[in-house]
């Protein structure tokens, strides 16, 4: 019988360009999520102080 050729995966070193693209993509995604979180917190703070300034809410507990 003739020898069968089996395709084996050849191991290569890390691809620098691929690593940079993956790192950049993950970094931008994480940064975008962080900025969205930060903007949401800023909005909550701004709404709180607007309500406080208009007198609709108070931070002092009224005693009865």
UniProtKB/Swiss-Prot annotation:
Record localization: Mitochondrion inner membrane
Q: Which domain of life is it from?
A: Eukaryota
| Keywords carried by this UniProt record | Membrane, Mitochondrion, Mitochondrion inner membrane, Transmembrane, Transmembrane helix
Chief location: mitochondrion
Q: Which GO terms describe its cellular component?
A: mitochondrial inner membrane
User: Which residues span the membrane?
Assistant: 15-34
User: What InterPro entries does the record point to?
Assistant: COX5C
- State the family named in the UniProt similarity comment for this chain: Belongs to the cytochrome c oxidase subunit 5C family.
Check the record and name the PANTHER family matching this protein: CYTOCHROME C OXIDASE SUBUNIT 5C-2-RELATED
Job description of the protein = This protein is one of the nuclear-coded polypeptide chains of cytochrome c oxidase, the terminal oxidase in mitochondrial electron transport.
Identification of the protein by name: Probable cytochrome c oxidase subunit 5C-3
């Amino acid at each position: 019988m003739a020898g069968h050729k089996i395709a084996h995966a050849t191991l290569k070193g890390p691809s620098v360009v691929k690593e940079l693209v993956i790192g950049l993509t993950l970094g931008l995604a994480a940064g975008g999520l962080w900025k969205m979180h930060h903007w949401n917190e800023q909005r909550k703070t701004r709404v709180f102080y607007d309500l406080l300034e208009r007198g609709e809410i108070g931070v002092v507990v009224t005693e009865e």
